[in-house]
Amino acid sequence: MEAALQGAEKRFTEQLAMFQISLSPEQLRQFRQFYENLIKWNEVMNLTAITEEEDVYTKHFLDSLSIVGLVGPGSFDNLSVIDVGTGAGFPGLPIAIAFPGAQVTLVDSLQKRVGFLQETVKLLGLENVQIYHSRAEDFGRIEAQREHYDIACSRAVARMNVLAEYCIPLVKKGGYFIAYKAERIKEEMAEGKKAAGILGGRVEQVISFQLPGTDYNRTLVQILKEKHTSGKYPRKAGR
């Protein structure tokens, strides 16, 4: 018989229920191990400024899974998802844990972070994750990766037009780029819409919300890939 959930885990499962996500004891164990390994590695390298247990569960894990507000919790089976500029693994690793039927690719430019991600994936026993050490602008120029994914997503700190140039080239025609942003992104959206159009995409919807049970305001921007992206994008670094 499983022990009763307490503290951050109990609140996490209650919050996820509002997204219609239910986790098995094994998945909860994986989130627990992810948290513990994140804190361990964070002592020797800068992975996150958020370290309190409940904050990690809410502002990293729950926030990463808020993508179901656009995709739907039952829609991830057999989807290919790429997380560009994943950092400490957000949103990609929570998506991989919660939706084992999805194939998740993580891309990050820093070898030390890639080392953390590799150890974490092995520790958690995740078989649906691939990790690449690459700059986003270089990865998007690899022919085998272009227009290869159903969904590209990113929580990276960059303006919408920059994220669009890194991510839209990786998305299949008919797929989506989804950006996780803070509450106020109005000033970014004009240039974001323009960039999306040049890259073959169209902003389909923008949803702003509070994470369930918190006062944490978030926005998701969903861009539909309607046309093929010109081979000149993403532009090389420094251009």
PLM features: residue spans?
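Conserved beta-strand signature within the Rossmann-like core of class I S-adenosyl-L-methionine
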Residues: 174-184
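Conserved SAM/SAH cofactor-binding pocket of Class I
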Residues: 65-158, 164
